[in-house]
């Protein structure tokens, strides 16, 4: 999961590197369920943007 999220951050650098980093920081603090939800949301945002 974390590797995919990091790859997602690399793809999103043009749109907003700070946002991706903020999401990663939030994920480290929150429980695993939240991490999974945010990772799925990031996948969908990649497809729609």
Swiss-Prot record:
Main location: membrane
Cellular compartment(s): Membrane
Protein name in the entry: Uncharacterized protein YKL096C-B
Topology versus the membrane: Single-pass membrane protein
Domain of life: Eukaryota
CC per GO annotation: membrane
Sequence intervals crossing the membrane: 31-48
Lineage of the species this protein comes from: Eukaryota, Fungi, Dikarya, Ascomycota, Saccharomycotina
Keyword entries, A-Z: Membrane, Transmembrane, Transmembrane helix
Organism: Saccharomyces cerevisiae (strain ATCC 204508 / S288c)
């Amino acid at each position: 999961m974390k590797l995919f999220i990091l790859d997602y951050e690399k793809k999103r650098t043009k749109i907003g590197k700070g946002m991706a980093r903020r999401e990663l920081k939030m994920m480290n603090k929150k429980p695993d369920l939240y991490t999974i939800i945010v990772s799925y949301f990031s996948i969908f945002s990649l497809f729609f943007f």
